[in-house]
Amino acid sequence: MAEHDDGDLIAAIRGLARANVLVVGDLMLDRYAYGRVERISPEAPVPILTVTREIAMPGGAGNVVRNLTALDAAAAFVSVVGDDQEGSDLTALIGGQPNVEPWLLVETGRATTVKTRYIAAGQHLIRADRELVMPLTDKLGERLLKIASDAMAATSVTVLSDYRKGVLAPTIARNLIASARSIGRTVIVDPKGADWSHYAEADVITPNRRELAEAVGRDLPDEAAIVGAAREVIGRFGFGAVLCTRSEDGMSLVTVDTVRHYPAEAAEVYDVSGAGDTVVAVLAAGLASGLPLEIAARLSNIAGGLVVGKVGTAVARPDDLVDAVKPASGALRKVVTRQAAAEAAERWRQRGWRIGFTNGCFDLLHPGHVHLLEQARAGCDRLVVGLNADSSVRRLKGATRPVQPEAARAAVLASLASVDLVVIFEEDTPLDLLSAIRPDVLVKGADYTHDTVVGAREVESWGGRVMLAELLPGHSTTATVTRLRS
């Protein structure tokens, strides 16, 4: 496959859904508390965060699994949680992931690792960790090894995601690698610590620059130093390849006789949380779907660049990767999926921007539509337009509508300067889309009343408001269609 062939790369991305990957490693609960800072505490010179929203998601090895499912790949997941509420929360969160076969063992007396990040205006204020690092009991370790070794038979790639919380003790890591090699399975290790001897014979190891420097005991100031260090650990531990992530400098893939440097793909960096997990997941899915190592590494580099441009522990989806390889041109860049719109809204929110939302069929765009959209945009910093899909319009307007198909309606809307994003939705109402975007301002025409605006109660529940825009008399899509037919 030629690296420059966009068509082949897009086919490779679509093929990631064929992957079936085993993930073994440390699972933790990632919590995010978002809010605003408006004053300093009178008790100490520290900011007061007024929390407005909290979310929780699987972290550590669980984030590798999240990224695999975001690619539509299948995953078997083996890990350990404590017998506490956080462990129960993680079990539910992992159980809610599609295409995952979870094997979460519960250990009495173990405290589930929890990392809580406090964020305001897109900036991390502090991270609070609660953890008790301890090895597994011999009995539980043997059980984990048996389950993981059995799961290897149904998967083609095994990922060891080591955060040094006790699941991947040296003996367990060695035995898992030996089991995988005995049946011809590829092993990827995301390492931790300075001693990598228990990762010996892994096919690919994925350190960042700091971790590789720690393993060889010296600074790595440039590409030549990174290549030298990578070949040193390849020679010492028998690795097939080292994929070193280098932050703003991209990634380097090193084998005994080849070197490839991939430049950084990120346009803007908002949050590096979990980016390494994304790289590992895409690499694993690529290899599991039959891609050459060089192409899988290239896709993982693209994916890493995407997630650092998002807020929080984010994932890269196939459509994201396709757009990065072959971006839409012109106004069509504004036509996005619900998930992409929600992620954009979160970035805008962290910058303190007010998000506006309106929706409709916008079948034959007329001056009345333009007037409403301009008022909506004047009442916010960024405007998202929900556009009824063709099926939704037919249910609402009848079998003869829409006149224009959804792709054409979306393209015309996206060409307007007042519109920042367009999202097509299949439902009869935009409630689900509203809940995903959580706008500050919900805009409808003045022919509505507050009580008849769908989503008014929901928007006001999170502190938003409803705006009724004045209408421009004499303009109606229905009237235009009637005139055309007569």
From Swiss-Prot:
Give the Pfam families listed for this entry.
CTP_transf_like, PfkB
Look up the EC number in the record and give it.
2.7.1.167, 2.7.7.70
Q: In which pathway does it act?
A: Nucleotide-sugar biosynthesis; ADP-L-glycero-beta-D-manno-heptose biosynthesis; ADP-L-glycero-beta-D-manno-heptose from D-glycero-beta-D-manno-heptose 7-phosphate: step 1/4; Nucleotide-sugar biosynthesis; ADP-L-glycero-beta-D-manno-heptose biosynthesis; ADP-L-glycero-beta-D-manno-heptose from D-glycero-beta-D-manno-heptose 7-phosphate: step 3/4
- Has keyword ATP-binding? yes
Instruction: Write out the GO cellular component annotations.
Output: cytosol
What keywords appear on the UniProt entry?
ATP-binding, Carbohydrate metabolism, Kinase, Multifunctional enzyme, Nucleotide-binding, Nucleotidyltransferase, Transferase
Show the segment(s) annotated as Ribokinase: 1-331
Q: Where does ATP bind?
A: N208, R209, R210, E211
| Single GO molecular function | heptose 7-phosphate kinase activity
- Give the region (Cytidylyltransferase) as residue ranges: 357-486
Q: Which residue positions are annotated as catalytic?
A: D277
Q: Which biological processes are named by the entry's GO terms?
A: ADP-L-glycero-beta-D-manno-heptose biosynthetic process
Reaction(s) this enzyme catalyzes, per UniProt: D-glycero-beta-D-manno-heptose 7-phosphate + ATP = D-glycero-beta-D-manno-heptose 1,7-bisphosphate + ADP + H(+); D-glycero-beta-D-manno-heptose 1-phosphate + ATP + H(+) = ADP-D-glycero-beta-D-manno-heptose + diphosphate
| InterPro entries linked | Bifunc_HldE (IPR023030), Cyt_trans-like (IPR004821), PfkB_dom (IPR011611), RfaE_dom_I (IPR011913), RfaE_dom_II (IPR011914), Ribokinase-like (IPR029056), Rossmann-like_a/b/a_fold (IPR014729)
Q: What does this protein do?
A: Catalyzes the ADP transfer from ATP to D-glycero-beta-D-manno-heptose 1-phosphate, yielding ADP-D-glycero-beta-D-manno-heptose.
Matches recorded under PANTHER family = BIFUNCTIONAL PROTEIN HLDE
Quaternary structure note:
Homodimer.
Regarding protein family, the annotation reads: In the N-terminal section; belongs to the carbohydrate kinase PfkB family.
Record-given protein name? Bifunctional protein HldE
Lineage, please?
Answer: Bacteria, Pseudomonadati, Pseudomonadota, Alphaproteobacteria, Acetobacterales
